[in-house]
């Protein structure tokens, strides 16, 4: 995802937010806290499993998928959380997907989108999300803090996404409890698991780290397991002929 492409996405989000109605805040869906679960289950590399029909880099991935059935398969086979793409223009997602999945699973759901405004946070919570994504590269540090604080005040957890050391330091200054490392280079659009490995020496005690993107095989997961609490996997699961087998391959025993 080049900076130019990221800018295009953010311009689109700004237009969407401008048209978006401010929803009344609904009760928070009840499930376990992701950070607490990660704290108490550090003997295994946890899998955050994603429902994603398409992406800008790959185009269509799996347009015909039964999203609820896919999410329930994830849940039944030990996923710690379901990530749901809700961006319509670039990822062919929809807020209704989050709403439908959240109503049919008991584990946490993540609203995977480019969040730049409080209205989106309320909308995510009302659709059943218990975790939202905030991307350091998409926000000023001041705006990031405002949105982070607002989300936590609403009882949501936040996955703060980083890609390099400077962004990781921003997440640390923020006090983020759950931090993602995206293996996708925002300048070249290339992906490299080494991104996660290289940032690992800078991780801090008391925080939980998730590696995102470019994770396809058990070997990939084993490479990340010494450093991370979990991995976020989308394409590999959406393309898998045997989803159950694939998710089991990714759940690495760290004991």
UniProtKB/Swiss-Prot annotation:
GO function terms (MF aspect): indole-3-glycerol-phosphate synthase activity; phosphoribosylanthranilate isomerase activity
CDD domains referenced in this protein's UniProt entry, alphabetically: IGPS
UniProt-listed Gene3D superfamilies: Aldolase class I (3.20.20.70)
Keywords: Amino-acid biosynthesis, Aromatic amino acid biosynthesis, Decarboxylase, Lyase, Tryptophan biosynthesis
Annotated metabolic or biological route of this protein: Amino-acid biosynthesis; L-tryptophan biosynthesis; L-tryptophan from chorismate: step 4/5
Keyword Hydrolase part of the UniProt annotation: no
Reaction it catalyzes: 1-(2-carboxyphenylamino)-1-deoxy-D-ribulose 5-phosphate + H(+) = (1S,2R)-1-C-(indol-3-yl)glycerol 3-phosphate + CO2 + H2O
GO biological process: L-tryptophan biosynthetic process
Pfam family, one: IGPS
Domain of life: Bacteria
EC number(s) recorded for this UniProt protein: 4.1.1.48
Disulfide topology: none
HAMAP family xref list: IGPS_B (MF_00134_B)
Similarity annotation: Belongs to the TrpC family.
Name the record gives this protein: Indole-3-glycerol phosphate synthase
Lineage: Bacteria, Bacillati, Bacillota, Bacilli, Lactobacillales
